Amino acid sequence: MNKLIAGLEQQLAQLDAQSLRRRRRTTESPCAPRVQVDGRAMLAFCSNDYLGLAAHPRIIDALQQGASLYGAGSGASHLISGHSRAHAELEERLAEFVAPQIADARALYFCTGYMANIAILSALSGSGADLFSESLNHASLIDGARLSRANVQVYPHGDLDKLAILLAASTADNKMVVTDSVFSMDGDLAALPQLLALCEQHGAWLVVDDAHGFGVLGEHGRGVLEHFALRSPNLVYMGTLGKAAGVAGAFVAAHKSVIEWMVQRARPYIYTTAAPPAVAHALLTSLEIIGGAEGAERRAHLQTLIAQWRSALQLQRWRALASDTAIQPVVIGANDVAMKIAAALYEQNIWVPAIRPPTVPAGTARLRVTLSAAHTAEQVTQLVGALQQLEQQD
C-alpha cells in the first residue's frame, strides 16, 4: 500500500479507537425539528436554525425570486463584476440594522462566518499588533489570529483580570481583543460591557463574533450589542446569516472607515467569488422578519422553551451547563459514553450530536442540545424525558 495512504489510515484507526472519528448524516428534507435523516424520520435538536426561518415560505419565495432576477451565480469577485444590486441592498440594510449600536456604520457581506473572521483579524491587525484572544473562541477566530501575524496572547475563559493585566502591559499601537459573544459549545455569554470598557480604556479594538446571538438576542434581534446596549467606535461586529437568519453567509459591521479598509485589504473578501445574489435577495426578507413582529414572537417562544428546558431537566450525574441561550449542553464526560447516549437517543428517533475533543476539552464530551423557535413544548418534554431515562439506565 502507498506509504502516505497507509499513514492516514493508521491515524483514522486511532480516531476510531478513541471514539473521535466524525461521521456525516444525510438529511433529505428542509431544516426543521421534524426531518428525514438517512431515510428515517427524526426529531432534531442539533441545528442552529434558532428562529426556525430556514424553511420559512416567504424566504423560500424570495430566494426563488432572486434566482429569477439575478441567475444562479455571481460570476466574479465583488471587486470585479460580482457585486450585485442585491448585495449592495443587503449591506445597506445590515448597516441600518446595527446603526443604533455603531455610529457611521457600514456592513460587508461574506460567503461564510469563517471567512469574515479571518478577514477581520488579517486586515485590522498584523505584524506589530497585539491580539488578545479568549481561550474558548471559535476555530475561525483561532485560525484568523494565527494568520494575522500579530503577537497573539490567549487569556483564560472569562478572566477579565488577566486580560486587564495583558492590556496594561502592551506597548503596541494596534491592540485588539477578540471574543465570541455566545460560546458555541457552552452557551454562556461573554462579559461584553466589561470587555468594551477595557478596550476603550486601553485604546483597543473589540472584535465580537455574534454567530449565535444575531437574530436571537435583543429586543429587535440585533444581537448581543443590543442585548447589552453597547455603542462604541471601537466595536467590530461579525454576525452570521446562516443560523438565526436561516439562509447563508455572514457580515462584518463597523465604522465606515473600518469597512472601507477591509474592502481594500481583506483577502478573504477580495480573492473569492461573491455569493449568489439570490442568497442576498432572500436575506432581505429574513432581516425584515427578524426585525418585525413575527421575529419578536419567535424570540419570545424560544425563550419560553429555554425556560421550560432548564426547569424540567433534572440530572443526577450528568451536568447541564448554565446557559440562558438556545445552546443547552449536557456534559457526559467520556467520549465513548457520550457516543453511546447519542446513539441511544437516535434509536428513539431523537437526533442530538455528541461533541468530543478537540472541539471541547478532554473529559467533557457532551450532547449539544440546540433549541429553536420551531420546536414545541411537547417536543422539549419528549427530549427531557428521554435524557432522564437514559441517565438512570447508564
Swiss-Prot record:
Q: Which Pfam families match?
A: Aminotran_1_2 (PF00155)
Cofactor names from the entry are: pyridoxal 5'-phosphate
Pathway the protein contributes to: Cofactor biosynthesis; biotin biosynthesis
- Which residues are the signal sequence here? none
Where in the sequence is N6-(pyridoxal phosphate)lysine found?
Answer: K243
Q: Which residues bind substrate?
A: R22, H138, T359
- Please give the catalytic activity noted in the UniProt record: 6-carboxyhexanoyl-[ACP] + L-alanine + H(+) = (8S)-8-amino-7-oxononanoate + holo-[ACP] + CO2
- What processes does the entry annotate via GO biological process terms? biotin biosynthetic process
Q: How does it assemble?
A: Homodimer.
PANTHER family cross-referenced by the UniProt entry: 8-AMINO-7-OXONONANOATE SYNTHASE (PTHR13693:SF100), CLASS II AMINOTRANSFERASE/8-AMINO-7-OXONONANOATE SYNTHASE (PTHR13693)
Described by its record, this protein's role is as follows: Catalyzes the decarboxylative condensation of pimeloyl-[acyl-carrier protein] and L-alanine to produce 8-amino-7-oxononanoate (AON), [acyl-carrier protein], and carbon dioxide.
UniProt-recorded name of the protein: 8-amino-7-oxononanoate synthase
Organism of origin is Janthinobacterium sp. (strain Marseille) (Minibacterium massiliensis)
Its lineage reads: Bacteria, Pseudomonadati, Pseudomonadota, Betaproteobacteria, Burkholderiales
